[in-house]
Amino acid sequence: MGEDLNIRIKDLPYEERPRERLIKYGPQVLSNAELIAIIIGTGSRRENAISLAQKLITEERGLKFIVNSSVEKLANIRGIGIAKAVKLKAAVELGRRLMLSTQGENFSVTSPEDVINLLMEEMRYLSKEHFKVVMLNVKNKIIAIETISIGSLNTSIVHPREVFKAAIERSASSIILVHNHPSGDPTPSREDVEVTKRLVEAGNILGIKVLDHVIIGDGRGISLKEKGYYDFE
């Protein structure tokens, strides 16, 4: 689209308007900015919806800016406001839920890569550490995935009581621990290994086996079991 992006979208040639392009060709042909423009619906007095969308996802920011930003932070951007910010966050959350419902339902875990692939896009851009528990039945199929804590991972924040309460309520046979490193580097810290040790020991007492601890970075993940950081047997 080589037109001046400050002109109103309705003044663009019919075949260049994002909504009409989506109807005719499908969503896969639209740019990220065009898809965002459809979500926010309108621009501002200064710029149209496409120009506004491009400002949101500059090369430095990318799509992860929308994922990581709060409603308030998005709303403070000129031309966005509360209504558009809420639409954007709702779209992100729907995408996250759809991904989990289609990939997680009756999903059998056969390797650490299964968990990494399942949670990578949800967790790779998070600005804080999120500690999750993947709960499995006796056939290693996912029952549920629950966020236990948000913040720097340490033994005071991740308490066995909270971890295994969720697993017991779901009648889980075993669990896999998962958390992200906002730095993008999934290499385990000493604290990561200490948390793992504590939870494995608690699981052995309760009869709920901790199978692994997976750390998500930016585009790659690490299994503490696979890499030999801790003996889960």
UniProtKB/Swiss-Prot annotation:
Motif interval(s): JAMM motif: 179-192
GO MF, any single term: metallopeptidase activity
Keyword Endoplasmic reticulum among UniProt keywords: no
The entry's keywords: Hydrolase, Metal-binding, Metalloprotease, Protease, Zinc
InterPro entries for this protein: MPN, RadC_JAB, RuvA_2-like, UPF0758, UPF0758_CS, UPF0758_N
Annotated MPN domain residues: 108-230
PANTHER family (UniProt xref): DNA REPAIR PROTEIN RADC (PTHR30471), UPF0758 PROTEIN YEES-RELATED (PTHR30471:SF3)
NCBIfam families linked to this entry: PRK00024.1, radc
Name of this chain's protein: UPF0758 protein TTE0897
